[in-house]
Amino acid sequence: MTDTPVEESLFQIIHCFHQYAARQGDMETLSLQELQALLMDNMPRFMDSLGRKEPYYITELFQAADKNKDNQICFDEFLYILGKLVKDYHLQYHRQLCARYCAQHSLY
């Protein structure tokens, strides 16, 4: 049986984390530079569509996710970052739906 699209997406997230974590230092954690590269290489349109391309946004995400303040992001902390990004994108998705609905029904 083949993986579902969601299962494949989850596998790709895990693989991507480890691919970037292995670039320097600990293979089980991301540095700030590794996180920046991961997000900008793999989600450039996503980050741009959120209006989040400014370098300080990723730094703020890193600091908020680094719960044990070791200046590294473990996989659990990485999931916090993904959750935050998905929530932001979900809100944007609803704003776009509302804007489309309002435009179609002359509510502006």
Swiss-Prot record:
Chain ranges of the EF-hand domain: 53-88
InterPro entries noted in UniProt: EF-hand-dom_pair, EF_Hand_1_Ca_BS, EF_hand_dom, S-100_dom, S100_Ca-bd_sub
GO biological process: endothelial cell migration
Cysteines engaged in disulfide bonds, as pairs: none
Pfam family membership, one: S_100
Gene Ontology molecular function terms on file: calcium ion binding; calcium-dependent protein binding; chemoattractant activity; transition metal ion binding
Cellular component terms per the entry's GO annotation: cytoplasm; extracellular exosome
Protein name, per record: Protein S100-A15A
Binding site for Ca(2+): D66, N68, D70, Q72, E77
Residue ranges crossing the lipid bilayer per the database entry: none
Keywords assigned by UniProt, alphabetized: Calcium, Metal-binding, Zinc
PANTHER family in the cross-refs: PROTEIN S100-A15A, S100 CALCIUM-BINDING PROTEIN
Origin: domain of life: Eukaryota
Gene3D superfamilies noted in UniProt: EF-hand
Gene: S100A15A
